[in-house]
Amino acid sequence: MSKFTYLESPMTIRGKVYRNRLIAAPTLFAHSVFFLPEIAENVYRMVENRAKGGFAAVSTGELPVNNEEGTTLFMERAIDMDDYDGEDFKMVKEYADRIKKHGALAYLEFSHEGAVAETKAPYVPWGPDAYVREDGVQVYALNLGMMEKAHV
C-alpha cells in the first residue's frame, strides 16, 4: 500500500472531476506560441504529453491578463481573446483541446507582472501604489478602472 493513500483517488472541486491529485505546473509562457512560432508545436506537444502521462490537470503557463497594464515579457503585440473565431483564440484553444483529449482538465495561468514588470519599451510597471523602485524605475498606480479589467 502506498503511503500516499489518496494520490490516485479522484476528487471533485466545484463540479470538476480530477481523476487523481496530480497537477502539472506550468513550464513555459503560454503566449510563447504567439511570438515564437517555430517552437509552437513543441510547446503544444510538451503540454499535451503531461495530460497523456496521467496528470489530472495541466497548466499552460503564463498568459497576460490584459494588453495595456498587464503586458509581460516577450509580448510583441496585443493578444485578442475577444474574437472567438480569431487566430489568437484558436492558438490558446489548441492547448485546451490537446489537454482535454487525454482526460485532463486544462487551465491557464494568468499573469500580471505588476510593479516588477520589465521596463524596456513598451513595458511600464503598474502596481497598487505609485512609487519609485530601488532601481530608480517609476511604478505607476493602477486605478479602479484598470483593476476592473481583470473581472470582465
Where are the regions that the model predicts?
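Flavin-dependent oxidoreductase catalytic cores
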Residues: 1-152
